[in-house]
UniProtKB/Swiss-Prot annotation:
One of its GO terms (biological process) is proton motive force-driven plasma membrane ATP synthesis. It comes from Buchnera aphidicola subsp. Schizaphis graminum (strain Sg). SUPFAM superfamilies: F1F0 ATP synthase subunit A. The keyword Acyltransferase does not apply. F-type ATPases have 2 components, CF(1) - the catalytic core - and CF(0) - the membrane proton channel. CF(1) has five subunits: alpha(3), beta(3), gamma(1), delta(1), epsilon(1). CF(0) has three main subunits: a(1), b(2) and c(9-12). The alpha and beta chains form an alternating ring which encloses part of the gamma chain. CF(1) is attached to CF(0) by a central stalk formed by the gamma and epsilon chains, while a peripheral stalk is formed by the delta and b chains. This is ATP synthase subunit a. Key component of the proton channel; it plays a direct role in the translocation of protons across the membrane. GO terms for cellular component: plasma membrane; proton-transporting ATP synthase complex. The lineage of its organism: Bacteria, Pseudomonadati, Pseudomonadota, Gammaproteobacteria, Enterobacterales.
Length: 272
């Protein structure tokens, strides 16, 4: 649906909640609002923006690392050093053990999630207008962390690391004992313990992904509602205060995702 053809707030809101999707069965764009009966559909917009932001993050940090100086740093180098020191202090205080992977992983998670969240502050009609006018795309959403597929994919990666370090540190037998001998250390409760621990284990990636998705989706929805329901001359008085408050949410959600990643991996890396 073209932006020019949207005639009421309901259509406007519905249009901005549609992803740019491609059907892998015929490699054609899915019409906005159409329900596809099979699984093989990709949200192209979320994938593209998340990859672009990831490459942007890597290029900035790589450029600063190549030009780093021991003298008085410039503004960008000073900012990155502050972020690095912040991440390192959190890892030291929360991760019980020594693992050279945890700090870089935490830095990547924090900055990448923050950049994805930050896209929520861009005016919601900007990229859809450009994509429709110049590329004839039927829909476009630009906040990857407001797509449950992206957030659950990231949490799935964390979950795989949890399983890897649990087996590595405790051994396969030790990991199985952890699932069956807690909280009641008796053979009678093996099945009961396993069910409890399985729910606890699976709830970590699910809650990690859903928490980020829920907060960012609701924030994006408020921006869409303001733009769709209010006249243009009054939107400023709600958009600006909400955007200022949303900066806190953006930063906080990136921090929470990073902290829980560190905590979960710390728990998995304990040998007992």
């Amino acid at each position: 649906m073209s932006l020019e053809k949207i005639s009421n707030p309901q259509k406007y809101i519905s249009h901005h909640l549609n992803h740019l999707q491609i059907d892998l069965c015929n490699f054609k764009f899915v019409e906005p609002g159409k329900i596809v009966s099979h699984f093989w559909v990709l949200n192209i917009d979320s994938i593209i923006f998340s990859l672009v932001l990831g490459c942007f993050f890597l290029s900035i940090f790589y450029t600063v690392a190549k030009k780093i100086t021991t003298g008085v740093p410039n503004g960008l180098q000073a900012s990155i050093e502050l972020i690095f020191d912040f991440i390192r202090s959190n890892v030291k205080s929360m991760y019980q053990g020594k693992n050279p992977l945890i700090a870089p992983l935490s830095l990547t998670v924090f900055v990448w999630v923050f950049l994805m969240n930050l896209m929520d502050l861009i005016p919601i009609d900007f990229f859809p207008f450009i994509s429709e006018r110049f590329f004839h795309f039927p829909a476009m959403r630009i906040v990857p962390s407001a797509d449950i597929n992206i957030t659950l994919s990231m949490s799935l990666g964390v979950f795989i690391l949890i399983l890897f370090y649990s087996v590595k540190m405790k051994g396969l037998i030790g990991f199985c004992k952890e699932l069956t001998l807690q909280p009641f250390n008796h053979p009678v409760f093996f099945i009961f313990n396993f069910l409890l621990e399985l729910v606890s284990l699976l709830s970590k990636p699910i809650s990690l992904g859903l928490r980020l998705f829920g907060n960012m989706y609701s924030g994006e929805m408020i921006f869409i509602l303001i733009a769709g329901l209010l006249p243009w001359w009054s939107q400023f008085f709600l958009n600006v205060p909400w955007a200022i408050f949303h900066i806190l949410i953006i930063s906080l959600q990136a921090f929470i995702f990073m902290v829980l990643t560190i905590v979960y991996l710390s728990m998995a890396s304990q040998s007992h």
